[in-house]
Amino acid sequence: MKKILILIAAVTLSMASFAREYSHDKDILYKGAPDGYTEKMCRIDVAYEKGGEKRPVIIWFHGGGLTKGKRSTPEALQKNGAVIVGVGYRFVSEVSIPETLDDAAAAVAWTLKNIEKYGGDLSKIYLAGHSAGGYIVNMIGLNKEYLAKYDIDPDRQIAALVPYSGQVITHFAQRRKQGIPELTPPIDHLAPLYLVR
């Protein structure tokens, strides 16, 4: 029995040695705050491993229909050692979609300026997001104007866009604001499909 307990302890300890230990810096303001709402929403969290070689960086935009949701650094993304930047942004109930997209671009700019101190590799910057976050990723990655405002060229400085379930037509939040019927799929300057090159 004693040998079995020793074996179980050894296996458990060896498994723990393979578990990744992430540090977390939270609630970092990434954009000048002209008002209380911007100061509250334009914040990021960074999850990273200390020491070692430079690591890929995933800038993660949460979902929520552009009207709700919360920034996060998903645990599923922390399994391979990447630095994860979870971005909060202002919702379209309070600002326009272009202002929300500018928040996202400002978060990317903050990341490019600061991520090396977290072990991030500037040659491996990935923009990723789910649902509304996927829409944001497509819009700021395909419409160069958003990132260009911050002297960023997505063709040179972003390794890939990884949108999960992001809308590619004009976002439903914008269609609702304009009174466009739900089954009408407009493709205008606020649609990733309009920007495909």
Question: For the regions a protein language model found, what residue spans apply to each?
Answer:
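Hydrophobic h-region of N-terminal signal peptides that target proteins for export
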Residues: 6-18
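Primarily recognizes the serine-hydrolase "nucleophile elbow" in alpha/beta-hydrolase
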Residues: 109-176, 188
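Short amphipathic alpha-helix adjacent to the substrate-entry channel of hydrolases
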Residues: 70-87
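Serine-hydrolase catalytic core
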Residues: 186-197
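N-terminal cap/lid segment of alpha/beta-hydrolase-fold proteins
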Residues: 19-52
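Positively charged n-region of N-terminal signal peptides that target proteins for export
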Residues: 1-4
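Short beta-to-alpha linker loops that shape the active-site pocket of alpha/beta-hydrolase fold enzymes
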Residues: 64, 72, 88-95, 167
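Short beta-strand element of the alpha/beta-hydrolase
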Residues: 54-63
